Amino acid sequence: MKVNVLATTALNPSPLLDAYEYRVSGAAYNRDRPTDADALGEAAGRICYKSFERKNPATASNPGYLGNILAQGHFSVLEHASVTFLVRDVSRALLTELSRHRHLSFSVVSQRYVDHADTEPVVPPAIRGTELEKPFREDYAEALQAYDAGVKLLRARGYGRKQAREAARALLPNAAPVDMVVTGNLRAWRDVLGKRWHVAADAEIREFAGRVLDHLHAVAPNSVQDMPTSPFGSDGK
């Protein structure tokens, strides 16, 4: 599994300065100042009440302001900043689970256009490194043989490559690898984490959620400051 940040929201502070004389610090990844994503959430919230003077010491800083937002559940201001990930070598099963999060946007490798005959399976965490991995890989190889044979048979009958693959892909297991680009705003990613960064979640998508959280700690640390370092439910609650 490979999860990498492909794009994040960049903040242009000039309009806020011109309109409200509001100064924001948005040097991304500088620990002494809020990141662009965190600064945007704060700026959006302050516009609601025009509270640009930072009179309340408890919410004068970006961590304090966003901490109060999180405590009150006013997550709408987190919808302005987005993070895009390049995700590789996850299973089709994970894609099925992740696509239930309606506010994410997906661009996924096509099983109709792209040949899958030489792919490697995504081994579930429970099987990875155990005596079950070898037969698991053998079963996947057999499925690929059936897939490849199906494509060739349909091609011999006059079907084009796309038509042959669209029929033969029904033979591909859930372990077939998927590459995709996934975009979500911070509120959407928090929703993913709340459901998938949990001991009761599917093991592979829980691993994915952990990778996402690691990146969000760099991109928007104050917007996920309440997220636990261990999956929800680890303490038995």
From Swiss-Prot:
Task: Output the GO biological process annotations, alphabetical, semicolon-separated.
Answer: dTMP biosynthetic process; dTTP biosynthetic process; methylation
Q: Which cofactor does it need?
A: FAD
Asked if the Swiss-Prot or TrEMBL record annotates the protein with the keyword Calcium, the reply is: no
Q: Name one Pfam family in it.
A: Thy1
Q: Where is this motif: ThyX motif?
A: 100-110
* Ligand binding (dUMP): E97, L98, S99, R100, S110, Q111, R112, R169, R196
Q: Pathway of this protein?
A: Pyrimidine metabolism; dTTP biosynthesis
User: What does UniProt list as catalytic?
Assistant: R196
Q: Name one GO molecular function term.
A: thymidylate synthase activity
Q: Where is the ThyX domain?
A: 22-230
Cofactor note (record)? Binds 4 FAD per tetramer. Each FAD binding site is formed by three monomers.
Entry keyword annotation includes Signal: no
Note the SS bond partners: none
Keywords attached to this Swiss-Prot or TrEMBL record, sorted alphabetically, are:
FAD, Flavoprotein, Methyltransferase, NADP, Nucleotide biosynthesis, Transferase
Question: Which amino acid positions bind FAD, per UniProt?
Answer: S76, R100, H101, R102, N185, L186, R187
- The residues forming a coiled coil are none
What's the catalysed reaction?
Answer: dUMP + (6R)-5,10-methylene-5,6,7,8-tetrahydrofolate + NADPH + H(+) = dTMP + (6S)-5,6,7,8-tetrahydrofolate + NADP(+)
Which EC numbers characterise this protein's activity in its record? 2.1.1.148
- Database matches in InterPro entries: Thymidylate_synthase_ThyX, Thymidylate_synthase_ThyX_sf
So what does this one do?
Answer: Catalyzes the reductive methylation of 2'-deoxyuridine-5'-monophosphate (dUMP) to 2'-deoxythymidine-5'-monophosphate (dTMP) while utilizing 5,10-methylenetetrahydrofolate (mTHF) as the methyl donor, and NADPH and FADH(2) as the reductant.
**Assembly and oligomerization:** Homotetramer.
State the similarity comment: Belongs to the thymidylate synthase ThyX family.
User: Entry's NCBIfam families?
Assistant: thyX
Q: What is this protein called?
A: Probable flavin-dependent thymidylate synthase
Q: What is the native source organism of this protein? A: Streptomyces phage phiC31 (Bacteriophage phi-C31)
Its taxonomic placement starts with: Viruses, Duplodnaviria, Heunggongvirae, Uroviricota, Caudoviricetes
The encoding gene is 16
